[in-house]
Amino acid sequence: MQYELRLVEFDDVLPVWQNKLWPGRQSPIKPMSSMTLDRQYDMSIYDNYEPFFWAVYHNNEIVAVNSGHQTNATEFRSRGLYADPAHRGKGLAKMLLNELLVCAEAVGCNLVWTVPRKGSEHAYLSAGFVFLGGWFNEGMEFGPNIYSVCYI
């Protein structure tokens, strides 16, 4: 199968997030999040950084997405990783995460972090992420989740 990775816009990934990754989500889906790795919230993220969005296409249809943005000068967050079940196991998540790692390094970050959902462990481990602490549900609409980091 032919897959094409593209840098896209928020409006391209939003329908996938709304309908497939976070169906029925109560909180608004924004291009970025104010969450930080130390489990705090920093509203200045919205003013200081720009988000990046990627999609993997197959036959001109989006089959996988991810996004990322800085949360401070040296840390970059991966957010919204999703691969269509019919296309899982083909390395698409790893492709997206590797592209995100390249982007994070290009903007001067040395650490990428994320809060993956249970069931997606393999994708993150295959891209070099390690898990921090244990699984939790508190504060998450779609848990359980775990903090995870990858050092660049």
Model-derived segments and spans:
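Conserved N-terminal entry element of GNAT/NAT acetyltransferase domains
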Residues: 1-11, 152
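Conserved active-site tyrosine of GNAT-family acetyltransferases
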Residues: 17, 124-125, 129
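Active-site rim helix/loop that mediates acceptor-substrate recognition in acyltransferases
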Residues: 17-53, 57-58
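Conserved beta-strand in the GNAT
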Residues: 55, 61-69, 77-82
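A conserved beta-turn-beta hairpin within the catalytic core of GNAT-like acetyltransferases
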Residues: 70-81, 88, 140-141
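Conserved acetyl-CoA-binding loop-helix of GNAT-fold acetyltransferases
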Residues: 83, 89-102
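Conserved GNAT acetyl-CoA-binding A-motif
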Residues: 104-117
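Conserved catalytic-core motifs of GNAT/GCN5-like acyltransferases
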Residues: 113-115, 130-150
